[in-house]
Regions:
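Signature of N-terminal electron-transfer/Fe-S-associated modules in redox systems
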Residues: 1-155, 590
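Short beta-strand elements
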Residues: 46, 174, 180, 184, ...
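Glycine-rich loop/linker segments at domain edges
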Residues: 90, 165, 171-177, 307-348, ...
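Flexible, low-hydrophobicity surface segments
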Residues: 145-309, 328, 413
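C-terminal catalytic domains of large/alpha subunits in multi-subunit enzymes
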Residues: 226-227, 378-383, 413-418, 472-582, ...
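Phosphate/diphosphate-binding loops
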Residues: 258, 264-266, 415-463, 665-688, ...
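Thiamine diphosphate
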Residues: 390, 394-415, 419-420, 620, ...
Length: 879
């Protein structure tokens, strides 16, 4: 018998079990999260006798006779303080890590109620946040300490929902207190547990699968193999090359390949059953690198060959340009695979729904899931309903199928609810990564430093399956030359299949890699010309009316020069400083369907927003709320954002390509204008005005009337729906037009990295052209989070493979933690006058792109060693 106190209540429990498992499964506490299972992420942080402890590496035996406290056990005043502070400063994004952060803050305050910033950083060293960059979390803890010292709280959270105001995130409170429900938090009666048996080898012929012993386990429900799939066995986000289950007689392509699916009555039984399945393999030599896979005699990973996709971007006369150039620089660069390391491992819960399936998920696009599940099950799409719960981070890593299709298949076959949640080890092994790339770049200029030619050859390791390797390669090529005037470019790209884990979407979408190479080359060119790295960028930066690398004409909202000017003084005032610029598209573009959609449904005195746009931490729900409030003048509490649901949420596309604020935001603006047109009719009828003749009634008059008659108007319009749709019209990548429109908008950025004489980062200055900041604190948080993610990419992160097998654990990925984060100064540049979504451009990806080359430039200035490989070697952070 084990006895302890949990949140002030005495507990007695006979079985010794993992503390995290007890808290989640027996005590039904949802604030403690299973982020890694190895004591490395801090999402399961609790207080044990008032001191921080990780629940995932403790047992009931270890805490016998002790007191355990979770967020649920805080006093009401403590909950108010933490909720207010974290909301106030914008410290919450995806929210998965936040309860653990709160507990670490509480543990710190138990011993020190007046901590320094360094002491706060040390206190949360064991907590990983992948979204915020820690900056605003540290501010929230500082503010909380101040309030606790004062002993009182003034409730003054921002409730003005207008554009340009830092409205408190609509979901912040639930995430802070741990009441926000992610998929793995869901409990359903009669739930079965599912998992896949994965191959032992990255490349092997599956000769036999024997499930007889496993079927004799008393707690087995079913075991499925490839022959049990009723529909199309091959799935894929774009290319259908990824088998949901590997069949007998088929080769495995990477260690994440699933051989069999098991449904069991308990998690414990699930592990036992998986071990009883016998698979006979013929191990084959894996193709470890693109250079190996591209050999003429290399075995084919897929029937079409090992070259998945090729791209070319060519303009001008590159040969003549090189002949006439004064200075030429050529270098080769290497960037690694990297892991998204979102804090919430993949999870899905599926159940029978009539003659179809209902799937609860936490991904970046419910309609993509619906389509792929319907193909797998051989059912019409209308038979598959997908509902998103809260999503604990994505960064591109939750665009592909991981567990959703397997959960749906099991639930459909056994007619029971089934949950599949990946362990962190499985997550690191299975989902697509950032592409490793080998990039050779030649950059040329005239005697004044004006760019004359840019040549690049990019080889991307797309791993075992296509995922989004094609579009990633395309974006790497179209953005490689940067936001500069250069009339002569020749960029080629090749995506190659290997037996490594698949590579796909990752924040920056290929641009992070190609810009690293291009920007580093530019510094050497400046050196040859005899001008500064800032000056060569300013001389070549595009202005409105200039032609971009892809032929598109830069629009009036182009503000790369403004970002350069914003940090010019910082650049010249510091001795050891690196600089880098970039551009990044908003929207999928290149002639593909790119649509934002929403329905505004008036119900019970509230405007309900229904859209499939996934919030993965970026705060799209808050943005939509502010757009509605801007137009109507209503309070944010009159707006409710629903969870994405294929049953009643219009398809607004995947949360990818930094598109949702612009595309879904514009759809919401259009729908809200339709709503206001109806309000105007109501006003006209009440005031005996002929609406058709008096269509120019001042908007301010209508807004004021609506505010004075809110409940009355909303009741009159009860059950009315107002649909909004925005279609981004663009040209295909191979358009014959001289100046095609590849994307509806581009954001621009310049970042500085400032080092001290020991090579330690002092500050990152990040100036970003965001068009219009709908919510400034939200924009700052995106900048800070993107910067810190790329601090790791530049300096410490890696995803090592041993013969195609991942060998990293969560704790060894090299993720940046709070104590290492330097000062980050976000500078918001607003120039865009476009009506689309009030001029907002996407900010989610571009924040992580220029950081690595800026840091490389700073180290080159420090020691004159020109580093061409990431993570950078021989630095303060990696010797």
């Amino acid at each position: 018998m084990y006895e302890f106190v949990l949140n002030g209540k005495k507990i007695s429990f006979e079985e010794n079990m993992n503390l995290l498992e007890y808290l989640r499964e027996e005590a039904n506490l949802t604030s403690v999260k299973n982020g890694c299972g190895e004591g490395a992420c801090g999402a399961c942080m609790v207080l044990i006798n008032g001191v921080q402890g990780r629940a995932c590496i403790n047992t009931l035996e270890k805490i016998n006779g002790k007191e355990v406290q979770t967020v649920e056990g805080l006093s009401e005043f403590e909950k108010q303080v933490f909720s207010w502070s974290f909301s106030k400063v914008g410290a919450v994004q995806c929210g998965f890590c936040i309860p653990g952060m709160v507990i670490s803050a509480k543990g710190l305050f138990n011993r020190n109620l007046n901590p320094s910033k360094d002491e706060i950083k040390a206190a949360i060293k064991g907590n990983v946040c992948r979204c915020t960059g820690y900056v605003k979390i540290i501010e929230a803890i500082e503010l909380s300490a101040q309030i606790f010292r004062q002993g009182k709280l003034n409730f003054d959270l921002e409730r003005n929902g207008s554009i340009g105001k830092s409205l408190t995130r609509i979901d912040a409170m639930d995430k802070i207190l741990g009441t926000a429900i992610y998929v793995d938090d869901m409990k359903i009666d009669g739930l079965a547990y599912g998992s896949a048996l994965r191959t032992k080898y990255p490349r092997a012929l599956v000769k036999k699968i024997n499930i007889d012993k496993a079927l004799n386990h008393p707690n087995v429900i079913t075991i499925l193999t490839a022959k049990d799939i009723p529909g199309n066995r091959y799935i894929g986000h774009i290319s259908k090359d990824w088998p949901a289950l590997i069949a007998v007689g088929e080769e495995t392509r990477y260690v994440g390949d699933a051989i069999a699916l098991v449904a069991a009555k308990s998690k414990k039984a699930l592990k036992e059953i998986l071990q009883l399945i016998e698979v006979e393999y013929e191990e084959l030599v894996p193709l470890t690198k693109p250079e190996v896979a591209m050999r003429y005699d290399a075995p084919r990973i897929h029937p079409e060959g090992n070259i998945y996709r090729s791209e070319r971007v060519r303009r001008g006369n590159i040969e003549d340009a090189l002949k006439n150039s004064k200075y030429i620089v050529t270098n080769s660069y290497s960037t690694p695979f990297t892991e998204h390391a979102f804090l919430e491992p993949e999870s899905a819960l599926a159940m029978p729904d009539g003659d179809g399936v209902l799937v609860y998920t936490g991904s970046q696009g419910i309609y993509d899931e619906q389509r792929e599940i319907s193909e797998l099950l051989g059912l019409p799409k209308k038979k598959i309903r997908c509902i998103s719960k809260y999503v604990g981070g994505g960064f591109g890593g939750k665009e592909d199928m991981s567990v959703q299709h397997h959960a749906a298949l099991l639930a459909y076959i056994i007619k029971m609810p089934v949950k599949i949640t990946l362990s962190r080890k499985e997550s690191i092994m299975i989902h697509p990564k950032r592409h490793a790339m080998e990039i050779k770049v030649t950059t040329a200029c005239d005697e004044e430093g004006k760019l004359t030619a840019f040549i690049a050859n990019i080889v991307a390791d797309t791993g075992a399956y296509a995922s989004l390797g094609g579009p990633v390669l395309q974006r790497a090529c179209t953005h490689a030359a940067g936001p500069y005037r250069c009339n002569n470019v020749d960029i080629t790209g090749t995506a190659v299949y290997t037996n490594n884990p698949p590579a796909g979407a990752f924040r920056g979408f290929g641009v992070t890699q190609s810009v690293f190479a291009g920007e580093c080359n530019l510094n050497l060119l400046a050196e040859k010309v005899g001008i500064s790295s800032w000056e060569i960028r300013y001389r070549n930066a595009v202005e409105p009316g200039d032609i971009l690398t892809n032929g598109q004409i830069a629009d009036s909202g182009t503000a790369i020069k403004e970002t350069l000017l914003a940090l010019k003084d910082k650049y010249y005032d510091n001795e050891i400083v690196g600089i880098a610029c970039c551009m990044k598209n908003s929207g999928i573009g290149v002639g593909l369907p790119d649509i934002g959609r929403c329905n505004l449904v008036i119900k019970d005195g509230v405007i309900n927003v229904r859209t499939s746009a996934a919030c993965i931490g970026q705060g799209i729900g808050t943005i939509m709320t502010q757009i509605i409030c801007e137009i109507t003048g209503l309070s944010p509490n009159k707006v409710a954002i629903g969870f994405p649901d294929t049953f009643d949420s219009p398809n607004s596309g995947t949360t990818t390509a930094s598109r949702q604020t612009l595309f879904t935001g514009e759809a919401v603006r259009i729908a809200t204008m339709k709503f206001m047109e109806e309000v105007m009719k109501q006003y006209s009828e009440e005031n005996l005005i002929n609406h058709t003749k008096e269509s120019c009634i001042e908007r301010s008059i209508i807004r004021k009337w609506l505010l004075n008659n809110t409940d009355k108007v909303l009741n009159l319009l009860n059950d009315r729906e107002f649909y909004g749709e925005y279609r981004g019209i663009t040209d295909p990548i191979n358009s014959p037009k001289e100046n095609p429109v590849s994307h509806v908008a581009y954001g621009y950025a310049t970042q500085l990295a400032i080092l001290d004489k020991n090579g330690k980062l002092k500050e990152i200055v990040a100036a970003h052209d965001v068009g219009r900041a709908i919510n400034p604190i939200n924009v700052e948080g995106q900048i800070e989070g993107g910067v810190v993610m790329s601090l790791g990419y530049a300096l410490t992160e890696d995803y090592p493979l041993n013969n195609c097998i991942p060998i990293a654990k969560f704790g060894t990925l090299g993720l940046f933690r709070a104590p290492a984060v330097p000062n980050i100064l976000p500078i918001i540049i607003e120039k865009n006058t476009s009506d689309l979504a009030y001029g907002a451009k996407g900010i989610g990806e571009i924040t992580s792109i220029p950081t690595a080359p800026a840091i490389q430039g700073a180290y080159y200035m420090l020691d004159h060693k020109f580093r061409t490989t990431l993570p950078l070697e021989d630095t303060f952070y990696k010797k």
